[in-house]
Amino acid sequence: MQEMYTICETPLFTKYCLVYWTQEEYEEFKTFLALNPEAGDAEPNSGGIRKIRWTSGGRGKSGGVRVIYFNRLTNGEIWLLTLYSKKQTVQLSKKTLQALVEKLNDSFND
């Protein structure tokens, strides 16, 4: 049996999630990612952040959303950090990605 990981999400992700997805689309994504935690591309120099393309509102992956997430597989967790439409943001900066990882790591140490 394939290992399934716990999906956790930041308040920022929660805020935007249902803007882009129906509840059904969201559940489909979470199930896929829980079974395939390394499906997205690793973002260079980001401290372990990954990005995956996913459909939104019937548009294909290229016109859908980008989901930014962070694996803590040794703890059995995948953290959904944020998501955005390709039309809104082309790429998050290295500095933004590093700040997301720092904030997440700080929360683990609290």
Q: Where are the language model's segments positioned?
A:
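Localized chelating/binding microdomains
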Residues: 6, 14, 51-53, 109-110
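Amphipathic alpha-helical interface surfaces
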Residues: 9, 25, 29, 61-64, ...
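Compact soluble domain cores
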Residues: 12, 21-41
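Juxtamembrane/interface motifs at transmembrane-helix termini
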Residues: 36, 47-50, 100
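Basic/aromatic recognition patch in beta-strand/loop cores that engages polyanionic ligands
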Residues: 43-82, 88
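Enriched for short, Lys/Arg-rich terminal
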Residues: 71-110
